[in-house]
């Protein structure tokens, strides 16, 4: 409802009805919801009112059934009725209900309710016209030739029939004449039968023999809408000649590109980091992130992995260890993508505990990680118990949390509430917890941002960056809908289908105190504009993001993969070529280890970020 009230126009209209796309995304779902609620209330009122009138004898079904020549059933109901009194054995008089004619007020009430019900059916039938643009009945998604030339006229006739039936229901309530109403209802049933038979016959006899010619305009609608909805209309196609030999001048002109050629892939590097840099069994490198940093005045591509705490790997799983002592991960391992030691190991710019950095751009002064990718449990900080920071040889270094993250347990009621919420009696009874203690929960960064903005869709791969000596998580967020007319729906990450997407938001989470900030990255997206109207203090302009973080923004892999999948088909803009799938592309497959060629078991190539200078450009890009 809030989206309906704050709706932002798309500035684009559908090709069939000429309505702005915002009508389908924001308005139509609300109309359908409201109509469904109203219809449910009317049906409930009909059932309750009809039951009461029957029990009171104000509604005579026998008369109604007699109009349909159902005399035997009418006789069983007792025919006409009246109310009489009779005394039994000299006792008080007892009222006896005997069938009589329907009460005029009851009939009027039922007639009005029937009229309202049939009116909602008429409105719902009219709204179903617009659903034709977000369903598939022809060769492509959206209304096809049969829909435009057969279904739309049938639906309009149905709307007229239900509207007429609503008026005649009101007429029945006022006059008691039921036959005209039954005639109108019979007309709606007939139209329903026609709508179930005629379109299929029309499709087989008229459309199928010459489908390409008939469907060409609608294929064009689908191509144009899909390219707009997925942002493919912004793609600039260039032809790059690849038949010229590489010269020394080419190498010199692309020196930075060559310096940043990746020698390390994520999977083997993650395994290597785990072997040489986890240091303790309760630490875990969950992922390796690819980013770029300016080091000594030169852009370098860096592989970076945060060292998170894996509480399930603690040798002693006592409550005090899991909740009060071992509370956070510590530091990162990071190195260039293009260097290897003589032993075949990665060169590390940041390593060990406490983290030692060989370059000032990657120096971390606040290495504690209280919020991460695998931190799923609550912890309590600033307690009487020592809080483990990091191991130092045979000894441990301890710390006290100095951040503002979490909630202060400064009252018995608040402590009782969280003890009940997390099902922990020990939290309530522990003598280590003080009024200054803070409980930190929702520490998984993906779950954390989703709780703040559940209406956004988030990228699967949060990545950590070093900025001004601190660690931050950046999570790309998308605005999506499955209501964009004529746009082909596809699943994102194998989950729910959508047919419109924009990378409209960049979410930033402080790894130390959990502060979440959302920055509006696409000022032209109508959906994020609508959310910004609803939650004006939630989304900040991208210009407010610190420059130290802006330099680490990137094009997300999830949306790039989705756009690639769409573009394999929708690079074809000629309807005939598209219809025949004459130029369908395939995403390359990667051969498995030990195999010379990709086979059926090979996985599709995934996107990779790299630093390179494209032909015709003056400088390298990421």
State the predicted function of each range:
Residues 1-622:
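Soluble extracytoplasmic regions of secretory-pathway and membrane proteins
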